[in-house]
Amino acid sequence: MKKRIAVLANGWNSENLSNFMMGIEKYAKPESMDFYVFLSFASYGYNESNRKAEALVYEIPELNTFDAIIIFGPGLNFQEVIDRIQKLADEAGIPVISIGLKHPGHYFIGADNYFGMKQLVDHMINKHECRKLMYIAGSRENDDSNIRLKAIRDSAEEHGIDFGEDDIFYSEWEARRAMEYIRTHFKSPEDFPDVFLCANDQLAITTSQLMEMTYHLEPKDVKICGFDHLDASRIYYPSMSTVDQEYYSIGKTAIETLDTIFEGKKPEVEVMVPCKFVVGESCGCNCGRRAMKERKTYIRKQQVDNRFASFKEGRIFELERAIIQGQSYDAVKKNIRTLMNGGTSSEGNTFYIMFDPILEKIGEKEEPLLPRLSLDQEYFVVCGKKNNVPSISEKVNRSDIIPDDPRTGPNSIYLIGTLHLEDLICGYFIMGSTAKNIRESDFSNYKTRIDRAFFTYIKNLQLNTLNKKLADLMEQDSLTHVKNRTAYDKYIKAFQKLVKTGERKEYAVAYFDINDLKVINDKYGHEAGDAYIRNSCKLICDTFKHSPVFRIGGDEFLSILYNDDFKNREELLASMKEEMENRKASRDKYSPAAIVSIASGMAVFDPETDPDIMSVVNKADVHMYEEKARMKKGNIR
């Protein structure tokens, strides 16, 4: 049976993660390991609810059921998230390999950020004679950003260059913040530093674009360097001078560490993999031939990708629609299964959507009462397939992650993310992937669009529930809480259809009128009169427990009797009259409002003489007035 390895990472760092997993994929022994990659897409631009919901993906796995854990530190920008992950890993009691984050008891594999950044800065100072340096940093708490900062400081000090806090801006890894800072801080190109040193390639590319859009500068007019050696940095013009962190080699080292552990041996506790400075056009060097080759390769790939882009978009749109158009939880499940189990697909051979049981209760509970940031132990398998074989299980335990998984065959990589509306967790989904495809946006696109569809679905469901409640209130008598005249008119139309189709062959109508309501109101007040009506209604409802009761007038009620109430109608009506007599005989035990007097009349449907239900109602009404007249003669109170 294959080993299960949990990989905890941030989805926005997909390219570095992809390179790392490519090293793992290449060097893992065949049919030896499956990798469950739990991806959070939390960023500094998210509100707190969304950040916490994204981070909950690391709580989905029961880590002690895995054989090892890999914490992919780059991109884990929130210290509280890092602390939580490390705590969960410690509690699991299994081997932990930490990439880029040192922690007691964990095997550490790191990229030598310092060495690569030092090479880059030395190059800018020595070859390009840069003396005024500016660092667009990540976040203050991020180790990688701070190690790169130390390399800049050390290089500046060695060359006698002033570099202080005013030469650092913390972007929180957000390009927008970097752009705003540069626009407000530098009024003209004359104020620019000799080089913008950026904590990653994305910040570097954004800075380069800003130079052209805002300051109308050509690439040769400003020097910009990045870090990471992302695909975009190679094909961008100018290609970025940057640092390759050699994540492929780090992935290879991680596999070597795992193999050593599983062989019962002790691997090295700490390994540093050298980074590599990569010269590009953005620093002023001439390497256009290599960059042009990269761009041609990219263009060819884009032409191929564009052929499938509309197909993928159409598939995701269909999935969105399947969720949004569902008017109930069961309808959504059916819609998704119909879509996913039929026809061709763009989501790959392995794909699962799991629903949290809370989705069944969305319409039943008020929104404030729904559990927040909460995971269930069991999840419903809405749709699932592994290697194009449909899942047969309806539920999956969280400890298994994937249902019906024999854990045999080729090594697999599963990408896993939460589905949520703000801090309401709706479930999780899984997409099988190759290491190379992790850098593509398919997984994040599916996740974003499903989350968005859930927003519309849940809001629609809540609105439908609210409308139903309002409709129910419109059909409910406010005093007695039985159905009112509006509901009665609606009900008898539907009931008449059942009679016509033969679905309802036997029934009776019981008509009731409360006696002496005016006497109670005049003698004891209207509050007592209201209580008198409620007590009368309760006696009717308690008598005919299995039949609908309607208040059709101020002191008039009607019930349509069928099934057991129809069969036992005479005995039930007699018991109601007996109860009224018992209360009258024991006046000292009851309040005046409880000693009720109700005239009643009953009529049974006769298909030979009754053309419709109103004919039966009218007969019951006549019988009721006949009894009312008799009761008045008998001086009922």
PLM feature spans:
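Catalytic-core segments of nucleotide cyclases and related cyclic-nucleotide turnover enzymes
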Residues: 526, 569-577, 588-591, 603-637
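Short regulatory/linker helices and ligand/cofactor-binding micro-motifs at input modules
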Residues: 306-338
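Helix-loop-beta substructure at the N-terminus of cytosolic sensory domains
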Residues: 325-369
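Catalytic core regions of nucleotide second-messenger enzymes
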Residues: 266-271, 503, 550-553, 580-600, ...
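Bacterial carbohydrate/catabolite-sensing allosteric modules
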Residues: 1-317
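Conserved long alpha-helical elements within nucleotide-processing catalytic cores of c-di-GMP signaling
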Residues: 484-508, 515-542, 550-554, 558-559, ...
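Signal-transducing coiled-coil linker helices
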Residues: 311-315, 335, 426-478, 486-497, ...
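A short, aliphatic-rich beta-strand micro-motif
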Residues: 403-420
